[in-house]
Design a protein with these regions (language model features):
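Secreted/periplasmic carbohydrate-active enzymes, especially glycoside hydrolases
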Residues: 1-184, 189-192, 213, 228-229, ...
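Aromatic/hydrophobic pocket-lining residues that form π-stacking "cages" and hydrophobic walls in ligand
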Residues: 181, 217, 233
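Short, acidic/turn-prone active-site loops that include or flank metal/cofactor-
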Residues: 196-201
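Active-site-adjacent "subsite" loops/lids of carbohydrate-active enzymes
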Residues: 202-212
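An active-site-proximal structural segment forming one wall of the substrate-binding cleft
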Residues: 210-224
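Catalytic-core segments of hydrolase enzymes
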Residues: 222-232
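Conserved small/polar residues in nucleotide/adenosyl-binding loops
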Residues: 233-240
Length: 244
């Protein structure tokens, strides 16, 4: 797919590591969630940012405003509906509007989920305070005759097969995958391990590229509630130590 974007001089940043222009970090406090939202704005002078959260049905939940030069805010969701894996993959939507003299000049929306997780050596993976055994697959973004250029149709077919197996977690080996598939992981409640293409042996000349790709992977995907781990350790069998 190809997307052509036309923007005003003041707009949400398109060059911040390929990220969507807004970062959402929900933190659970009892039954409530505090949503730390940050928008990245190019040419912010004279602009404000409006943050609006809606539920799955599109009903308003909470909102806030911030100066575009430092577009950060904390928004509280009372009695937050948790994103709880395949059992209940509930998603909220944050819509962020850039206003200049009261006029909307840019707008983006991103979905997110309210959840907490932990990994315990005795209890295993814990989601929202409850043991959540992981049973999953490793997935490559690849098809005969298509290669890496999958469409939404093939991504959905892959996800349907994974769900049919009864899996609830996916390792996305071992490069950035399509946002279409990350969205499907959010919607279906998959727990995701994401990776960059760092394979087999360390190349000293590739250190800067490794750090750049990991930064991009995190920034581009941090809003996805499905992602719980990012990795650069594919087939690390030939060396005993690595320092980045």
């Amino acid at each position: 797919d190809v997307t052509v974007l036309g923007v005003e001089e003041s707009h949400f940043d398109l060059d911040y590591y390929g990220a969507p222009g807004v970062q959402v970090v929900p933190t659970m406090q009892g039954t409530d969630a505090t949503v730390a939202a940050t928008a990245y704005v190019t040419a912010p002078a004279g602009c404000t940012v409006h943050f609006a959260i809606t539920n799955r049905n599109g009903d308003p939940v909470a909102e806030a405003d911030a100066d575009a030069a430092n577009a950060k805010t904390n928004i509280k969701i009372e009695n937050a509906h948790l994103w709880h894996g395949t059992e209940d993959p509930y998603l909220y939507t944050l819509t962020v509007t850039l206003l200049q003299n009261g006029k909307a000049v840019d707008e983006i929306a991103t979905r997110f989920g309210c959840r907490s997780f932990a990994i315990d050596p005795q209890k295993g993976f814990i989601l929202n305070g409850k043991p959540y055994p992981l049973r999953g697959v490793s997935r490559h973004q690849d098809r005969p005759g298509i290669g890496n250029a999958l469409t939404a149709k093939e991504h959905t077919e892959d996800m349907d097969l994974i769900c049919e197996l009864g899996a609830n977690t996916i390792r996305l080996a071992h490069y950035q995958h399509s946002q279409t598939f990350y969205d499907l992981c959010d919607e279906r409640g998959m727990v995701v391990w994401a990776e960059i293409p760092y394979i087999s042996r360390h190349m000293p000349g590739g250190k800067a590229n490794t750090i750049s790709q990991m930064t991009e992977l995190i920034c581009q995907n941090s809003n996805h509630p499905s992602i719980v781990a990012v990795s650069y350790t594919h087939l690390r069998a030939h060396e005993t130590s690595l320092h980045l």
